[in-house]
Amino acid sequence: MRTLWIMAVLLVGVKGHLMQFENMIKKVTGRSGIWWYGSYGCYCGKGGEGRPQDPSDRCCFVHDCCYGKVTGCDPKDDFYIYSSENGDIVCGDDDLCKKEVCECDKAAAICFRDNMDTYQNKYWFYPASNCKEESEPC
């Protein structure tokens, strides 16, 4: 029952393209992005401050920085077009901004895959109060 409640809480804030990001993470890693990265470390999930706690958390930090550089659309709400070709994610959209968002998500999904062995359960639902160190620049 507790697991169902946690999943419901994590899904409440998911909008627009964030479900595309979830699907992309699942395709690349075989893991649910919401479950594994929805509230992890200092940067995975809503918000982000302090220093990334490990390489998996750094994937989220870099993803947040990538979103911060996107202009002309809303990275969390706007849908983009992508496909999977020979196991690779291919971002294809006539809208440059949406393509950039897709590329941010693709890079994060690949980063999660490449750092799966660094994932530490102690950073799952990590308290924000532990994320007070000075943040590094993007």
Swiss-Prot record:
Primary location class: secreted
Pfam families, alphabetized: Phospholip_A2_1 (PF00068)
Signal peptide: 1-16
Active-site feature positions: 63, 105
SMART domains (UniProt xref): PA2c
Recorded catalytic activity of this chain's protein: a 1,2-diacyl-sn-glycero-3-phosphocholine + H2O = a 1-acyl-sn-glycero-3-phosphocholine + a fatty acid + H(+)
Tissues/organs with expression: Expressed by the venom gland.
CC cofactor: Ca(2+)
Disulfide cysteine pairs (residue numbers): 42-131, 44-60, 59-111, 65-138, 66-104, 73-97, 91-102
Residues the entry annotates as binding Ca(2+): 43, 45, 47, 64
GO molecular function: calcium ion binding; calcium-dependent phospholipase A2 activity; phospholipid binding; toxin activity
Protein's GO biological process: arachidonate secretion; lipid catabolic process; negative regulation of T cell proliferation; phospholipid metabolic process
Family: Belongs to the phospholipase A2 family. Group II subfamily. D49 sub-subfamily.
Protein name: Acidic phospholipase A2 pgPLA 1b/pgPLA 2b
